[in-house]
Amino acid sequence: MKMFNFLTKTTLCLVVSTALLTMSADAQKTQKLTDPEIASVAVTANQIDIDYAAIAQKKSKNAEVLKFAATMAKDHQAVIDQAVALVTKLKVTPKTNATTKSFLAGATKTKAMLNAKSGKAFDKAYVDNEVAYHKAAINEVETVLIPQSSNSELKSLLQSAVPLFKAHLAHAQMVQKNLK
């Protein structure tokens, strides 16, 4: 019974994370994002992962999970810093939109779920979420944000982030495998 509850909760975590980004991708197929909206999506998605990492840094006792969370916080902050520098240079203000609102709503649920867990169950839920989140984020960047961006510098920033996100996914999958 404990294994069933554990698997059910882990599955819920993955569903919430994947649904968050899938819903936004589906919504954006019918509505083109502007560059200020794309900047908002990029900053929001990166900040959400920093928030997840902060939870992991407070709750986890696993050295590998803690190291991964520190990497997520550092790398995603660097992407935000690059995005902020670019929008400042371009004199563009990121614009909140349906996608950013959807991300934030999903993140609220995921953070509550993560905060409700502890020990090995937390570590597994956090890392499983990171795998799902990075898969969905890579898809969102490649299929929505890059194709819809008009500004070449914004497009270039997004393209340069994809290899980093793919490295994060590989790292998360490695940690996930080691937790089993």
Language model region names:
Residues 2-14, 19-180:
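His/Met- and acidic-residue-enriched segments that coordinate or traffic transition-metal cofactors
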